[in-house]
Design a protein with these regions (language model features):
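Short acidic, glycine/serine/threonine-rich helix-capping segments at coil-helix boundaries
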Residues: 144, 159-176
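Sec/Tat-exported extracytoplasmic proteins
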Residues: 55, 59, 155, 159, ...
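...with weaker cross-activation on analogous glycine-rich loops/strands in unrelated enzymes
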Residues: 76-139, 181-191
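Active-site or metal-binding loop neighborhoods of secreted/extracellular toxin and effector enzymes
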Residues: 176-249
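Cysteine-nucleophile protease catalytic domains, especially the papain-like/related folds used
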Residues: 4-95
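Primarily a LysM-type cell-wall glycan-binding module
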Residues: 138-158
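Extended terminal accessory/targeting regions
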Residues: 7-8, 14-21, 124-129, 186, ...
Length: 249
């Protein structure tokens, strides 16, 4: 008796990964640069201050939406979005406005997004807020181990663009590159410098579609806002705060 034929092997269908569409630029975005946020500014500037480009050399507390305008700080659990956009706008009423995520900001403004964490792995009943800001240009200082290919991959741009930014010359540590790239960055409180990747290590093209699950799971998208690209202030108005306004353009 002949052997029974084996059933055909089933091929599992895989769902192709959807490419995240980049959001429109106003061309007034703050360039992505690590310094001074990565070193001297790491501890004194949280995600809110970073998103609106309000660098200060010293802060005695983290910046909170509504604090600058004098609203009570401790009223919100940050597990929901109610009232938060109004608090952000109240800090800079003529310099911030709400906008649909897919709509371009007007000239002189750039886009930020706000999310909150309804849950966390620590068992805390309070949540947290978090902000992202959009960029259209990268200012990058080359470091040991960099290649034109690795930089292109990191920022999701063609190799030829990085090669052109480098003048077509060999890699040199310390050399500064400037090139176009459309993505969002964020800063994890006082713990990190600027980050262009999400919790999965992927470049953030649209924060709404990024992995936002850290110790706090920032699963709730609140809104997008357009922020004036200069002169925005957040946090305490205490006289001890030393201001080092960055040149933004």
């Amino acid at each position: 008796m002949s052997a029974r034929p084996k059933p055909p092997t089933r091929v599992r269908k895989t769902t192709p990964t959807k490419k995240v569409k980049a959001l429109p630029l106003s061309k007034s975005e703050i360039p992505f640069r690590l310094e001074p946020w990565h070193t001297n500014g790491r501890r004194s500037n949280n995600c809110y201050a970073y998103a609106v480009n309000d660098y200060e050399s010293y802060r005695f507390s983290k910046s909170v939406p509504g604090e600058r305008s004098g609203k009570p700080v401790g009223f919100h659990t940050y597990t929901h979005c109610k009232g938060l956009a109004d608090r952000v706008i109240s800090d800079n009423p003529k310099k911030v406005y709400k906008v649909p995520a897919a709509k371009k900001c007007k000239n002189g403004y750039y886009k930020i997004m706000m999310v909150v964490a309804p849950s966390n792995k620590y068992g805390n009943f309070t949540g947290d807020f978090h902000f992202y800001k959009q960029h259209g240009v990268v200012e990058y200082k080359m470091k040991e181990g960099d290649t034109y290919t690795s930089i292109a991959k990191r920022f999701g741009v063609p190799y030829s663009r990085i090669l052109k930014a480098g003048g077509g010359t060999p890699i040199k540590v310390g050399k500064k590159l400037r090139f176009k790239a459309n993505f969002f960055s964020h800063k994890m409180g006082w713990a990190t410098g600027p980050l262009e990747t999400d919790a999965s290590g992927k470049l953030i093209k649209d924060p709404r579609k990024a992995n936002r699950k850290y110790g706090y799971n920032y699963s709730k998208y609140c809104c997008s806002m357009c922020v004036k690209n200069r002169g925005v202030d957040v946090g305490s108005t205490n006289s001890k705060v030393g201001k080092d306004r960055l040149k933004t353009l």
